Regions:
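General marker for long, soluble alpha-helical cores
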Residues: 1-191
Length: 191
């Protein structure tokens, strides 16, 4: 086992894992890992998860880190992961309540910013079918999600022909002009 390519902090992690009896040598012999990925790997091995069939060769370091998090949280990553998926999209799949629903939108070609809004729809407990339309951009989706969180009916707002500013204006107007603006200013960071 050659540890020369690892920095001091990474070497310390590896030696600590070896002293604890974790089988880390067989994984680091195959591939070089970053410090963060080593942390995830050691955590997963400490939790007694089996990584014998884990495809380390198919994924890059960032992707492996998110897949190890999925293994740790017992998320079935084999249903949604593929080597072409960006690591920041994988991060959403690890923590989303319904990965199959997010996968549906990912396969339809939604970009990261739109997927992030869909992810928030799902985790807030709303049905993302409200914006099941490729004509919506992420700003329109964000305003519709804010309306749903404010318990407003979105029939009039879920119109791809409206700009996000028009949707925001209708949303504030639905709260009542005075109350809507006060609510918007006080709760901007929560919406």
């Amino acid at each position: 086992m050659n540890l020369d390519e690892y920095g001091g902090a990474s070497k310390g992690l590896i030696w600590d894992a070896i002293e604890r009896g974790l089988p880390i040598e067989k994984y680091i012999a195959k591939k070089h890992f970053s410090f963060m990925t080593l942390n995830y790997l050691i955590t997963v091995l400490s939790a007694k998860h089996n990584l014998d069939d884990f495809p380390f060769d198919e994924y890059d370091d960032d992707q492996i880190r998110h897949l190890l998090a999925a293994v740790y949280f017992q998320n079935d990553w084999k249903e949604w992961a593929n080597p072409k998926m960006k690591h920041y999209i994988m991060e959403m799949f690890v923590t989303v309540k319904n990965p199959q629903e997010l996968l549906y939108y990912y396969n339809r070609g939604f970009k990261y910013r739109e997927l992030l809004q869909i992810y928030k729809f799902i985790n807030d407990g709303f049905d993302p079918k409200v914006v099941d339309n490729l004509n919506f951009n992420f700003q329109q989706m964000r305003e519709i999600r804010k309306a749903l969180r404010g318990r407003l009916p979105v029939k009039d707002l879920a119109n791809p022909n409206l700009t996000w500013k028009e949707i925001r204006a209708k949303r504030i107007k639905a709260y009542g002009h005075r109350y809507g603006i006060e609510f918007y200013i006080k709760n901007y960071d929560k919406l």
